[in-house]
Structures are given as C-alpha cells and as structure tokens.
Amino acid sequence: MGVKELWGVLTPHCERKPINELRGKKVAIDLAGWVCESLNVVDYFVHPRHHLKNLFFRTCYLIWEQVTPVFVLEGVAPKLKSQVIAKRNELQFRGVKPKNSPECTQSQPSKGDKGRSRFNHVLKQCETLLLSMGIQCVQGPGEAEAYCAFLNKHGLVDGVISQDSDCFAYGAVRVYRNFSVSTQGAQAAAGGAVDIYDMREITSRMDFGQQKIIVMALLCGCDYCPDGIGGIGKDGVLKLFNKYKETEILDRMRSWRGETDKYNALEIRVDDKSICSNCGHIGKTQSHTKSGCSVCRTHKGCDESLWKEQRLSIKSELTLRRKALLSPDFPNEEIIAEFLSEPDTIPNLNLNWRQPNLVKFIKQIGHLLQWPEIYCFQKFFPILTRWQVQQSKQEKILIQPHEIIKKRTVKGVPSLELRWHDPSGIFKGLIPDKQIAEYEAEHPKGIEELYYTIEPLDMLETAYPDLVAAFLKSKEKPAKKTTRKKKTASEEENKENEPNSKPKRVVRKIKAQPEENQPLLHQFLGRKKEGTPVKAPAPQRQQCSTPITKFLPSDLESDCDAEEFDMSDIVKGIISNPNAKPALTNHDGHQLHYEPMAEDLSLRLAQMSLGNVNESPKVETKRDLSQVDQLPQSKRFSLEDSFDLLVKGDLQKLARTPVERFKMQHRISEKIPTPVKPLDNISYFFNQSSDNADVFEELMNSSLVPQDQEDNAEDEEEDDLVVISD
C-alpha cells in the first residue's frame, strides 16, 4: 500500500521515459512487489505460475537492455506490520472457514500468526529461477523496499524499481515506477517504459523530502498505521508543509504533545474577539474597518498582512493538532524509527553476472512453468549466448560460435546473426526425440535453427574479433575491373592505315565573350517601328442611355454599324453655337440639298420586303419550316439568319436600326404626317432657311405625335422618295 496520497503529490513531478534510459545502470528490484502484482491479476484466465512467467520475461528484457538487476528478497516482517499481514491473510483465504465457526472463537493461533510462510515459499521459487539465470539476489533484514532504499541511498545501485511508496519514507533517492514491457494495457509502451521519480529534483522544487513523507505517513496512513488520523487529508497536510521547512517539520510535530501551554495560548489568541482578526492588535475587527487602527496608523481599515494569513495558518495547525492528539500513541516513535533506521553495515555486493544454467532451468523450472523441454531451450539459449559474449574471458566455455549468417539491426543497434554449435555435446539428449521430430517437421532448417541468435556488433567485436573481421571482409565488394583492353601499337597503326576510317571530330570550345563586348538590353528593344506590324486598336464605344444592342439578338449585333449613325459632332456643333451658319457641302461644284420625306426609307423597305415574303414564300429555302415552328421562340431565333430577322422585325417587335430603337424606347411614332411648310424649305445644313427657323427642331417636334394616330396617318400619307440632285 505505502503512504496514502503520496503518489498524488509526486506524480506531477515524474518523467515517463523508455527503458533504454536505464542502459548500463544497476537497479534494485523489490521482488515481492512484482510477485504481488502478478498474483493480483484475476480478471481473466492466466498461467498457473504467472508470477514465474512474468519474472522470467521481465528479467530477460532487462538483460537485452544491458541493465544489471539486483533482486531484494523479504526478510523478517516488523512487528508493526503484523496487523496488516493478518488482514491480508484474511482477504486471501476468505471462504475457507465460516466466519461464525466455534473454532474461530477459540484462543488458538491462526494461520496469520505464522507470518509469511506461504509467501516466502513463492519467493523461494522466484529465487531458484533467478539463480538459474545467473542473477544476483540479496536477502534483506526486514522489508524489501527498506533495503532497496538503503542500497540506493548509499550509491550501491542507481535506482529502485518498486510500486510501493514506502521506499520514499525509507530514504530512496531515485524510484522507477510502472515498469512495463507490454504493448497492451494502460501502461503500454512500444519499447518498454517506466516512470522516473528523482527526489533530488523534487526537493529542490517544493522542499519535500523524507521527513515530510514520514509526517504524511503518520497523519494520512501507511502500512504500519493503515487508518492514519481521522479527518486529516492531503490538503491539510500540504498547508502544514508550506509553513515549515523539511528540517523542522518532524520536531514541530513532536512538540504538539509536549508543549501544551504554548498551543493553548495560541488557541486563546486566535479565538479572542477583542483582538482584530486582520492586524492582530487590540480592538474589534468591525471598529477597525470603520474607524481604522491607531497602531496601524490608518483612518479606515487596517493592515491585513500582519495577522490575517498567520492567524489562518495557526488555526489550521491547531485543528490538525487537536485531531492528532485524539490518538493516544501519536506521534508513534516506533514508526518513525522504522523509517529512519538503517543496517549497521554496508554490504559488499558482487553484481557480476554469473553463468546461466540451462540444465537447471529445464529440470527445475520447466515443470513449474509447464513448458516443454524444447520450448525451455528455445527461450533460455539466447540468455546463455549473451552471457558468453559479454564474459568471453571466462575459462569455462560451453558453446562456440560456428559462423556469422548476416547483418541485423535490432531497435537501431547494429547486430549480427550467429549460428552456434555444441562441440562437447553437453546439451545432447536434453530434448526428447519426439519433440525434436515435431520441430523438424515444422522448420525446414531442422534442430540447427535453435542455435541461431542475434548479438550486438560491438560485443562481438570485443569477444570474437577475428570472426567478425573475416565476415566483414567477405562482405566488402571488390573493386570493379575494367574490361576494356589496351590497344597495342600495331593495332593503332592498322587503324590509321584504313581508308574508311573517319576522322576524329574536333570539338571547338567557344570562349565566353567579355562583359565589355556583350550587347545591352536597350539594343534588343530598340527596333524600327515603321515596318513592325501593329494590331489595330478596337474602336472605342461611347456609353449612352440606350445601348446599341439592347433590342437585338446576339447574331444581329454585327449587322449594325455604330459609326454610320454617329451624330455626336453635329449635335455638339449645334448646341455650342446655334447662330453659326452651317457649312455647305459641295459635290462636283454643286451644293447638296434634300427634300423631307414623310417616312423612314429603311422602314418602308422593310414593309415592302415583308409583304413580298407573306405573299409568295420562296421555294429555294432548304429549312424544314414545320420543325422550326415546333421549336421554342429562343431556338427559332437562333436558327434564322440575320436577313430573316430583319424581314420579320415587325412581327417579332425587334428594332432594326439605332433610329428605330430610339423611337421604340421613347414611343415615337414611326409614321410621321407631312408638315405644312414652304416649298423652298431646305435642310439645316444650309444657310438658306427662311425666317431664321431651325428646320431640324421643327421636324423633331412634328414627329412627337400620339401612337394611336399611327394607323390613320398610314392610310393618308403617300410614299415620299429622297431625291438627291447634282
């Protein structure tokens, strides 16, 4: 169990790192912790000797990572722990005897009085397994975690692997928790991982060491006082730790029972209503808040930093003291002595890896693990070869490397695969023939495949340098030999005398021109503009209120020429100077003039062409009119050409010219009645107008007739033709 609530305080300061961080280090392992952890796995069916199986594979993993393990066995349990051991035995053997049995009421020694007889038997099996693997085991005088902490505190090992937080109370400096080599579960890791707790760093950060851990064990609970002090938790203990240093906390706790008068005076002062709870001076808190404090020299309120925080801290400590003194044996000096006591002598540990015993493992451990002999050989043989590679200078050598098969890389470490052989036949007859026959049937290489192992390259270079050098030399690629033969002098003479021999091509190297002779950029850009073809610019279109292509479909936009009806210059000239005389236009020495016409020539021509189409449709057309009539209106427009649209303009209400668009937009009548004017009236282009009247304006005014008079005007008007005379 350990110290209650201790892991919650230390976990924020731990570091999760891979197990290869422990490479080359010596670690002390609480063997009882690993065994209890394996025995508590009851959620699913496991191996009947799960603790042995788990111990074997975990130890193998440490060997592959070049970590030196030191397993510490349990000694004589302290008397303080007898109560805890009895409760554990009751939970372990529950259901064996009825609770109300008369035998239980008799004053007979129970099984719990025998101590750890059954548990020690399990530890003895584990010790036999470890000795067969050549791993060092150490017997502790008392608790295993206490001896592990002792070895770590005196520098004999680099750390402690344990799940019990009691090792911190015993003085452990570096603890490895949650050791895992599995790829499944909550503590899974790809290559093995462990939580590292370094008390040196934790003490420097929060002033939390062994003495405070002992006080926490007395107040919150531990293996020697499971219940602790009722009503005291982690938060109250941490507030007490913040008030006192690591070296003061244990003496302060011992003074709770001895210095009664001192704490009684503190209780009277803390609870005194005549003393201000903020500043600690004489006077009530309410009066100081309103009128101020004369000692603090304030007119309103008082200095809270003098007494308020200190009062709360003292009050919290007095509350813990009051609860702790309810226990008659608090503070228990036996528990404090158990955590602070150490063995008298420091042992001389021989941490060298001893030779593994394959025969002992198969004979003694194989039946406990319920493994067949060939499986035991397959799992244990790599341990023997690794020991021989590391301890190659030993005189007693059992097997020899036969050859190196190939290169390998294991977790980024360069390695080699070897095949070993047994020259003295020590392992002959160790595996039954039946198992060998079954193995050879499944593996084509036969029994020799059991003698294949993978070892690190650096270890092999130290142990067997000649074998490694020969293998690496055999893997080197020889230099490539040129297959081209050198020509002799006679062959060269014959080649020169051949008539068909082609002369050698001489490659001329072009020298780079100096920068002074290089052409400049403006010489490339300075071309003649006279003969250079230039793209004609697009005609500029003027924006107006009525776009040119507003009432025309897309295929008739090209039929209109905007420049032909551009009268902007004429309008500007009239507006800018209305009194100016118009310029006369001559043609072959004669002045041009015109006669007004009643209708638009283009409109008249369109009506005439429309009438001809309705009376006699042309036979030459190749369109199928029946199919065209069935199409929608938009499709029919797209199938007809521009001439058809011009002819059917009146029916489709389309504008054919810009003038017609202007009339349709402003609802100007297309049929204009002939105004009554003098016969000698001439165009505004000439300066012969009578009565100084603008004929163009009169023409426009007369054109604004209602739309409903259009039909009547059509019957009355006659066709007027434009006459242009020389």
UniProtKB/Swiss-Prot annotation:
Basic and acidic residues biased stretches: 488-501
GO MF annotations in UniProt: 5'-3' DNA exonuclease activity; 5'-flap endonuclease activity; crossover junction DNA endonuclease activity; DNA endonuclease activity; double-stranded DNA 3'-5' DNA exonuclease activity; four-way junction DNA binding; metal ion binding; single-stranded DNA 3'-5' DNA exonuclease activity
Keyword DNA damage on entry: yes
Pfam families registered for this protein in UniProt: Chromo_2, XPG_I, XPG_N
Name listed for the protein in its UniProt record: Flap endonuclease GEN
pH dependence: Optimum pH is 8.
Cellular-component GO terms for this entry: cytoplasm; nucleus
Keywords: DNA damage, DNA repair, Endonuclease, Exonuclease, Hydrolase, Magnesium, Metal-binding, Nuclease, Nucleus, Phosphoprotein
Gene for this chain: Gen
Cofactor binding mode and count: Binds 2 magnesium ions per subunit. They probably participate in the reaction catalyzed by the enzyme. May bind an additional third magnesium ion after substrate binding.
Organism: Drosophila melanogaster (Fruit fly)
Region described as N-domain: spans on this chain: 1-90
Protein family membership: Belongs to the XPG/RAD2 endonuclease family. GEN subfamily.
Cofactor(s) recorded in Swiss-Prot or TrEMBL: Mg(2+)
Binding residue positions for Mg(2+) 1: D30, E74, E143, E145
Taxonomic superkingdom: Eukaryota
